[in-house]
Amino acid sequence: MFGKGGLGNLMKQAQQMQEKMQQMQEEIANLEVTGESGAGLVKITINGAHNCRRVEIDPSLLEDDKEMLEDLIAAAFNDAARRIEETQKEKMASVSNGMQLPPGFKMPF
């Protein structure tokens, strides 16, 4: 089924890929991305584990209505989460040699 040394090479490649993925997971967990809404009036920075690290609100918004500010905060967080997921996909694609992950697949970190 496997040629001479084929299984050994396959196992070695799998181990190398596992090490690269572990390294990439650590990189991504430490990565910080900022999402914005309201043309940059609200900014939220999250890390690769989707933990909120920082919230910045332009002072001019503090005088406006509460509902609009809440919507802008939610939109900024969603933008940051989308950016983290895109970055994760890009980084993991480089490790997996472009192997496409199934739709909806979430990385375990």
Curated annotation (Swiss-Prot):
**SUPFAM superfamilies in UniProt:** YbaB-like
The record, for Gene3D superfamilies, names: Nucleoid-associated protein YbaB-like domain
Task: Provide the protein's localization.
Answer: Cytoplasm, Nucleoid
GO CC annotation terms, alphabetical: bacterial nucleoid; cytosol
Q: Which InterPro entries match?
A: YbaB-like_sf, YbaB/EbfC
Keyword Methyltransferase present in the record's keywords: the answer is: no
Q: Output the Gene Ontology terms for molecular function.
A: DNA binding
Kindly state which keywords UniProt assigns to this record, in alphabetical order.
Cytoplasm, DNA-binding
Pfam families found in the cross-reference section: YbaB_DNA_bd
Ranges of Low complexity compositional bias? 11-21
Q: Where is this region: Disordered?
A: 1-21, 89-109
Q: Which family does it belong to?
A: Belongs to the YbaB/EbfC family.
Subunit and partners: Homodimer.
Described function: Binds to DNA and alters its conformation. May be involved in regulation of gene expression, nucleoid organization and DNA protection.
Q: What is this protein's record name?
A: Nucleoid-associated protein PMI0140
Q: Which organism is it from?
A: Proteus mirabilis (strain HI4320)
Lineage start? Bacteria, Pseudomonadati, Pseudomonadota, Gammaproteobacteria, Enterobacterales
